[in-house]
Amino acid sequence: MNDSNKLYDLAQCFIPGGVNSPVRAFQGVDGKPFFVEKAGGAYLYDVDGRAYIDYVGSWGPMILGHRHPVICDALTKAIENGISFGAPTEIEVKMAQLLTQLMPSMDMVRMVNSGTEATMSAIRLARGFTKRDKIIKFEGCYHGHSDCLLVKAGSGALTLGQADSPGVPKDFAQHTLICTYNDLSSVRKNLEDYPKEVAAIIVEPVAGNMNCILPSENFLPGLRQLCDEFGALLIMDEVMTGFRVALGGAQEYYNIKPDLTCLGKIIGGGMPVAAFGGRKEVMSILAPLGPVYQAETLSGHPLGMAAGFACLTELARPGLHKKLTELTTLLVLNLKKAAQEHNIPLIINHLGGMFGFFFTDAKTVTCYEDVKKCNIERFKRFFYFMLKEGIYFAPSAFEAGFMSLAHGVEEIEKTISSARRCFAQSRF
């Protein structure tokens, strides 16, 4: 038995399922997880001494690569002043200023510690502002694990076959209306069925929690128009897409201005940091200015602010997102070519530094129902072949992949070479 298996057995004695987030348990690929000892650049190293080219990137935050010197230096300097104060600091003001500069739709911003807290707080704020109770979300989209959002959710809930979670009262769930991603008619129907009851539409502008689903040309503009027509707020969950598909997120790329934006992952540079922000008119009813309450002990944590400010400052350097897109495109085009050479039906959606695999004979994959029809067993075989070759993709057919700026041509060429060997197998 290797050290990873020993640690997993021990972990299951003290941690439910042996992991602190369900998708890490490898249940989506019917296996056991490896345990990480360290990381650097584009690589993870497990406790058994194996190295992996990492296309998971801590589920998105590590856009600069692991152990980037800019972030490490910022953390080292920050910790010399103390760990946590529970009082305002200059670095959180600088961080807020930077966020509002990079995301022009955000006049004001409130720092929190996780994407779940960001979306939960944004929805409470939207309800308080509009004095309405219902929200619209999309089947297969994941916005964290707060009760009202664990209805037809994506990410780990899909991996475990639990699109809804026990423990969510029906009284909560009844205020969450479900629509089909990329289908504006389903949105209009719900808005017409519940006039003046919908507080907000929350959407992943690129749906990264049912793999990687891109919005159709009219989808996001259509949502903006419908929100304006029916008096609802548009909340963009850019926890995953923020600073990854473009410096200003998907809202910059698609030229859409939401009322509220939720951020996470990259903004902490690997530390647990998230935020929500938007129009001053809406944000001004948040406590202590207004009646909508939100508070946390560790929000604006000085170490997280230092790491996040360093990460975003580095990302703002000219040319980095162009490079990230070029690296992702190089990987995607060559993986598609390798699949075609062996008559493997494979769709790869991608934008900026994120991508997703769909083993399917379909021409397009545009919504949750399309994702469910893909060949999950083929994905599992692909995942394990690549893992044995030292290539780590997300251990679930419902999770997006992530490129980092630490990846280079060498890592991509090794990935393509391994994929060709995988696709050449007769049993694949």
UniProtKB/Swiss-Prot annotation:
Keyword list, A-Z: Cytoplasm, Isomerase, Porphyrin biosynthesis, Pyridoxal phosphate
GO cellular component assignments: cytoplasm
Keyword Isomerase: yes
GO biological process: protoporphyrinogen IX biosynthetic process
Cofactor: pyridoxal 5'-phosphate
UniProt record similarity statement: Belongs to the class-III pyridoxal-phosphate-dependent aminotransferase family. HemL subfamily.
NCBIfam families: hemL, PRK00062.1
Subunit description: Homodimer.
Protein name: Glutamate-1-semialdehyde 2,1-aminomutase
Provenance organism: Hamiltonella defensa subsp. Acyrthosiphon pisum (strain 5AT)
